[in-house]
Amino acid sequence: MKRTNYAGDTNEQQVGQEVVLKGWVAKRRNLGGLIFIDLWDREGIVQLVFNEKENPEAFEIANAVRNQYVLEVQGKVQLRAEKEINPDMKTGKVEVAVDEVKVLAKSETTPFDITDGVDASEDLRMKYRYLDLRRPEMMRNLKLRSKVASIVHNYYDNEGFMDVETPDLTRSTPEGARDYIVPSRVYPGHFYALPQSPQLFKQLLMAAGVDKYYQLARCFRDEDLRGDRQPEFTQIDTEMSFATPEDIQTVTEGLIKRVMKEIVGVDVKTPFPRMEWQEAMDKYGSDKPDTRFGMLIHDLSDIVKDSSFKVFANTVADGNYVRAIRVPGGADKYSRKDISKYEEYIKRFGAKGLAWVKVTADGYNGPVAKFLNDQVAQINEEMDAKEGDLILFVAGSFHVVSDSLGYLRRAIAEELDMIKPDQWNYLWVVNWPMFEYDEGFGKWIAAHHPFTMLNEEDLHYLEDGEDPHKAHAQSYDIILNGNEIGGGSIRIHDPKIQEKVLKALGYTKERAEARFGFLLKALTMGMPPEGGLAFGLDRWVMLLAQADSIRDVIPFPKNSKAVEPLTAAPGKVSEQQLDDLKIEFDEKIDYKLDQDPDEQ
């Protein structure tokens, strides 16, 4: 029988009509002469009714089915009895009185219940991902992701962009994260790399005259495992010739506005606010500021530089900073023990301690209160502090202070429920530094990437004798509720400027040519001024769906150890495959996928 409609689309307009439905048994209830089955498909659930007196044959089959059996049913849509109406279900006013039923597939007992709020470990859910995706919450996420992707294609097509695919097998040009490399059988000892982004190819498309490009690009980064990072992800990738930052931002805002309206039902106001990178770091302690709440950071360096608290005075004398946040009403909410936990946590950012005072009617209470008697009035005025507030101080370098207070600000706001739900605060962070110092690599790197154009007034910093690390770039990140969802820039189209930027990053001419020669050559052959932006589809969909994890909006994700439990990837390959690739190992390697490689 041909299906007439999805189970979840059954409605009051079909009352009295015969329907054919196909789906899974979500729940079954036997009330003696009546059996009720909740039939599920991707659009939702409808209640089936089997009446022993009216149709004993169908009743007998229904009596034998179990959860997750696949059924085909034919029956008539009818209104539920008044007391049986379920206002929480889309189909809650109707049910289907079944005339015929056929079991299309049976199911063993599943390893966990196929319901929202399932009590199962994430790895177990991922091992049986095809079952996990049957849960209504997960199917909603998949549908939302599909709808967003559809809007993206439609929007950029209407804006005159061309959907152009770029290679997935390309040359290794690692910048920051490691490449995933693919050995060549045809050329032993040579390797392709999976793209970390289509960056260089989309610039070459501008050189080709494509003018406006976009694609939903698959990207791969062999990064250290932490948080919600995924080794493979999807980004909405765009590039425009002859464009200013404002042009690119306006087009991007148009997409966001449409997605928010159609997906969330919210009409966001454009243009979005713009915030300088320096302001974001100074006031929010983050280059992805969360503007849904206050508790801004205040610089108290000038106020405490002459205090009797030597830690503060010496920090300022060394050219560093003393900054603080005020927790409204925090004096009664946080004990010394609570504050000590935060102090331990911020040590990971390089902070040596967390000073604090509680504001009282007579001044301050706390470990450093006696050292700040002469500064109480100034500090209170600067921070608008009132009796009952808690003030937290961090002293140190710019990044130590910013990172520490930025973390504290967000953690405390979440703990005290200061963030209103259903707020959608988009903004642009602009005017980034061109370069930043990477403590891990022990060298200067590009804050975005080496192909970002500097501000015109900062080009002189690339000349000999100047300090290039003072330069700022024509770059911009799009932020949503304290999450970076994308970033972009105007690109360098002048080969001389590109050579100087690579030199500032420590590239010799030979190394630059070996790694980026194809791009450097393209810059000499009529490269137009151009720029673009890419933002992560996965993270954006996670925020739109208000999901707990990015893994909840990816059909088949990797876990936090970069393992896919469903297929047990990564896996070993045969000796023959290794021989074909001319690959051999110096020693036997036998990793277990349930352990971290570093622990084996």
Curated annotation (Swiss-Prot):
One Pfam family cited in the UniProt record for this chain: GAD
Gene Ontology CC terms: cytoplasm
Residues noted as binding ATP in the record, renumbered to the chain: R221, D222, E223, Q230, E484, G536, L537, D538, R539
UniProt feature coiled coil, ranges: none
Source organism, top-level taxon: Bacteria
UniProt main location, coarse: cytoplasm
Compartment(s) where it occurs, according to its Swiss-Prot or TrEMBL record: Cytoplasm
EC number: 6.1.1.12
Keywords from the UniProt entry: Aminoacyl-tRNA synthetase, ATP-binding, Cytoplasm, Ligase, Nucleotide-binding, Protein biosynthesis
PROSITE patterns reported in the protein's UniProt record: AA_TRNA_LIGASE_II (PS50862)
Gene Ontology MF, one: aspartate-tRNA ligase activity
EC class (word): ligase
Residues engaged in binding L-aspartate: E175, R221, H448, R491
Reactions the enzyme catalyzes: tRNA(Asp) + L-aspartate + ATP = L-aspartyl-tRNA(Asp) + AMP + diphosphate
Region described as Aspartate: spans on this chain: 199-202
A single BP term in Gene Ontology: aspartyl-tRNA aminoacylation
Biological role: Catalyzes the attachment of L-aspartate to tRNA(Asp) in a two-step reaction: L-aspartate is first activated by ATP to form Asp-AMP and then transferred to the acceptor end of tRNA(Asp).
Family statement: Belongs to the class-II aminoacyl-tRNA synthetase family. Type 1 subfamily.
Stored NCBIfam families: aspS_bact (TIGR00459), PRK00476.1 (NF001750)
Complex and partners: Homodimer.
UniProt xrefs under HAMAP family: Asp_tRNA_synth_type1
Name of the molecule in the record: Aspartate--tRNA ligase
Organism: Limosilactobacillus reuteri (strain DSM 20016)
Lineage of origin: Bacteria, Bacillati, Bacillota, Bacilli, Lactobacillales
Originating gene: aspS
